[in-house]
């Protein structure tokens, strides 16, 4: 006999899909623009429909443990108002006006760069639909999608490196330049 636990539904607020099923996934990327691409530093599934602001503290501590680097600034969207992060002066919410310098304003524009990363994770790396069972499956799917995305960036970089190496070792013949 096969029994599957029903997925909890959330009110999505969209006309085409009034209810959403599944869990929230938290994605963390660097605030600065890396040369190799926008890597995913941390991905985790959050169950029970938590408030965004309450998820910030645990996610940042996990991120600091994984990378070994203390985060200096965190740029989040307006859903994180009322967060419980211990260092409130390091969290910058979209649309914030007070204490915003020019460099922070420039970094806040980079916050929008995480949206295409989420889109690629959903469309090309199977984060949009999970085929794994249970809460552990949700967590594993989020981590595996992020790892696949990062691996694709590494493969793209290696492909460019190999192309440059082959062009250096085997230059095109002179007659090919004049065709």
Please state what every model-predicted region is.
Residues 41-45, 87-88, 132-135, 158-167:
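Composition- and surface-driven signal marking solvent-exposed, interaction-prone regions
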């Amino acid at each position: 006999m096969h029994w599957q636990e029903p997925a909890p539904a959330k009110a999505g607020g969209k006309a085409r899909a009034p209810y959403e099923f599944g869990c929230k996934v938290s994605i963390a990327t660097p605030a600065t623009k890396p040369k190799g691409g926008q890597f995913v530093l941390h991905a985790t599934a959050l169950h029970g429909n938590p408030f965004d602001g309450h998820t910030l503290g645990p996610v940042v501590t996990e991120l600091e443990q994984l990378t070994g680097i203390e985060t200096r600034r965190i740029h989040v969207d307006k859903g994180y108002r009322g967060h419980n992060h211990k260092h409130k002066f390091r969290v910058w919410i979209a649309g914030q006006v007070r204490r915003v310098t020019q460099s922070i304003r420039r970094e806040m524009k980079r916050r929008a760069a995480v949206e295409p990363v989420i889109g690629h994770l959903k469309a090309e790396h199977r984060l949009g639909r999970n085929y794994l069972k249970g809460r552990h499956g949700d967590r594993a799917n989020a981590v595996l999608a992020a790892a696949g995305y990062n691996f694709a960036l590494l493969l793209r970089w290696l492909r460019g490196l190999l192309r440059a190496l082959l062009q250096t070792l085997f230059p095109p013949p002179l007659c090919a330049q004049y065709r």
